[in-house]
A protein has these predicted regions:
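Accessory alpha-helical/coil subdomains and C-terminal extensions
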Residues: 36, 98, 106-111, 117-132, ...
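Short, ordered loop/turn segments at secondary-structure junctions
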Residues: 10-12, 39-45, 79-80, 112-113, ...
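C-terminal non-catalytic interaction/assembly regions of soluble proteins
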Residues: 253-407
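N-terminal phosphate-binding or glycine-rich loops at protein starts, especially the Walker A/P-loop
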Residues: 2-52
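Short glycine-rich or small-residue beta-strand-to-loop segments that form or flank ligand, phosphate
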Residues: 4-12, 73-79, 105-111, 137, ...
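Glycine-rich oxoanion-binding loops at beta->alpha junctions
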Residues: 49-105, 114, 153-155, 167
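Short glycine/serine/threonine-rich phosphate/pyrophosphate-binding segments
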Residues: 14-24, 46-47, 90-93, 113-121, ...
Length: 407
C-alpha cells in the first residue's frame, strides 16, 4: 500500500498558510507517512513533475518553527484551473499517473474557494476511476469567505494587521485640527469580512473608523457624502475603511470608475482590484471641498507575519494536522472546517465537511451584522471577530529583522 503523501499550496498567500503546511507535514510523519512531498507552485507545478521532499527540507524543529513564522507560500502558488474531468481528462490522467509513480496515498491542497474546487474535481475523478488516493482540502484565505466553517485560517492575522495599522492611521490623522478625511482601502472582492475587521481598531483608547463600506451593501454617493458631511460637523478628522470590492447599485466596482478593467485570472476573477479609496477620496474632495487622502493596505494585509495572531497560527496548524488525520482515517473529498463550540471562553474544534459543498461558493457578511445605514458593522461582528486576533507570536529575529525560511 502506498504510504507517501503530497501537499500543495494555491491561490493568494497569507501570514499563516505555512503553519497549515507545517501541521500537515508533522501529523503525516507521525501517522506513518514514509515520504512527504511538496508541489512547487501547486497543481500546475505537479503537472510539470516539480516536487520537493519535505522530509529533507524540514528535518529539524527550528525549520518547523521558522516555517510557522514565515509569510506567503513556502512551496509557491498557482491559479491553475483544472477542467471538468468529464470534459477533459488529460490533466487527470497525468496527475494520477504521477500519484502512482510516487506511491501517493493522500493529497492535501491548502487554499481557498478555487483550491477546494481542485480537491472536489480530483476526488470526483478518483472515484470514477476507482483510485484509493485520498484528497483533503485545507482551508486558507484572508477573505474569510469559505462556507461551512466558522472562519478561515489567515483571516485572523489579516484582521489583526488591519485593526492595528488603522488604529495607527487614526492616531496619525489626529495631529492636525484641519478638516480632513482618510480613506483606507482594504482587500475583499465580494465579501466584506476584512473591511469589517476595521471595527477592531476601536477600544477604550480609540474610536475606530467612522464609516465602514462593504461589498454586501450597494454604494450610494449622495447618501455617503451626506454622512461624511454630517460627521465633519462634529469632528475634524474622519476615517473611512472601504472594501476594494464596493460596488454601485448597478454592479460597477468603484475602482473601475477610476481605472480600466484589469486582467482576469484562470478562474475569471479580476486579478487586481485597486482604486476604490482613490475614487472615494476624489469624490469627497470634489463635492465637500476638504482635504482627503487615500491609503491602500494592499498585499501588506496578507504577509504581515510579524503581526500574526497566535490564535490564527495555532488554528492553521491544527487544521493541517486534522487534514492528515482525516486522510489516514480513510476520508476523501473533504475540507477541514473550524466549528465554534464556545464563545466565553472562545474555542473552536475541527471537523471534516464535504468539499463539494464548499467549492466555488462564497460566504458573505450577514446583513444583520451590518448597520441599518449600510456604513458600519454591528457589535455582533466585533464579538465574532475579536477572538480571532488575540495573542501574538514572537518572530525569530536575526540582524534586526524576522528570520524566514524559503526553498
Amino acid at each position: 500500500m502506498a504510504k507517501n503523501v503530497i501537499i500543495g499550496q494555491s491561490g493568494g498567500p497569507t501570514a499563516v498558510i505555512n503553519s497549515s503546511l507545517a501541521g500537515v507535514y508533522k501529523a503525516a510523519c507521525s501517522l506513518g507517512a514514509d515520504k512527504v512531498y511538496g508541489m512547487k507552485h501547486g497543481i500546475e507545478g505537479l503537472l510539470k513533475e516539480e516536487l520537493v521532499e519535505l522530509n529533507v527540507l524540514l528535518d529539524d524543529r527550528l525549520s518547523i518553527e521558522l516555517l510557522k513564522r514565515t509569510p506567503s507560500s513556502y512551496l509557491g502558488s498557482c491559479r491553475y484551473k483544472l477542467p471538468e474531468p468529464e470534459a477533459d481528462s488529460t490533466p487527470y490522467v497525468k496527475l494520477f499517473t504521477l500519484f502512482d509513480k510516487y506511491d501517493i496515498c493522500a493529497v492535501f491542497y491548502i487554499g481557498g474557494n478555487d483550491s477546494m474546487d481542485t480537491i472536489a474535481k480530483l476526488s470526483r475523478y478518483g472515484a470514477q476511476v476507482g483510485s484509493t488516493v485520498r484528497f483533503i482540502g485545507v482551508p486558507k484565505t484572508i477573505d474569510n469567505d469559505l462556507c461551512l466553517t466558522d472562519h478561515t485560517p489567515g483571516y485572523g492575522s489579516a484582521a489583526k494587521y488591519i485593526a492595528t495599522i488603522l488604529k495607527e492611521v487614526i492616531r496619525d490623522s489626529s495631529v492636525s485640527d484641519i478638516r480632513s478625511v482618510t480613506v483606507a482601502e482594504i482587500m475583499g472582492r465580494h465579501a466584506g469580512w476584512l473591511a469589517g475587521a476595521a471595527c477592531l481598531a476601536g477600544g477604550d483608547d480609540c474610536d475606530g473608523p467612522d464609516l465602514i463600506l462593504l461589498p454586501e451593501v450597494p454604494f450610494e454617493p449622495d447618501k455617503f457624502l451626506a454622512k461624511v458631511d454630517e460627521l465633519q460637523r462634529v469632528k475634524s478628522n474622519v476615517i473611512i475603511a472601504a472594501s476594494e470590492g464596493v460596488k454601485t447599485a448597478d454592479g460597477t466596482y468603484l475602482c473601475d470608475l477610476v481605472s480600466t478593467a484589469g486582467q482576469l485570472d484562470a478562474f475569471g476573477h479580476k486579478a487586481i482590484l485597486s482604486g476604490t479609496s482613490r475614487y472615494l477620496s476624489d469624490l469627497i474632495h470634489d463635492k465637500l471641498n476638504c482635504k482627503s487622502r487615500a491609503i491602500e493596505f494592499s498585499t501588506l494585509q496578507r504577509c504581515a507575519s510579524h503581526l500574526a495572531s497566535r490564535t490564527d497560527v495555532n488554528e492553521a496548524y491544527a487544521v493541517g494536522g486534522a487534514a492528515a488525520a482525516a486522510a489516514f482515517a480513510g476520508e476523501t473529498g473533504k475540507m477541514i472546517a473550524l466549528k465554534r463550540v464556545s464563545e466565553y471562553p472562545y474555542q473552536c474544534i475541527t471537523e471534516a465537511v464535504d468539499v463539494q459543498k464548499v467549492a466555488n461558493l462564497e460566504k458573505k457578511v450577514p446583513l444583520d451584522w451590518i448597520a441599518p445605514d449600510g456604513m458600519q458593522v454591528t457589535a455582533a461582528f466585533e464579538e465574532y471577530a475579536r477572538p480571532l486576533i488575540l495573542d501574538e507570536v514572537t518572530p525569530v529575529y536575526v540582524n534586526g529583522t524576522p528570520r524566514h525560511i524559503h526553498l
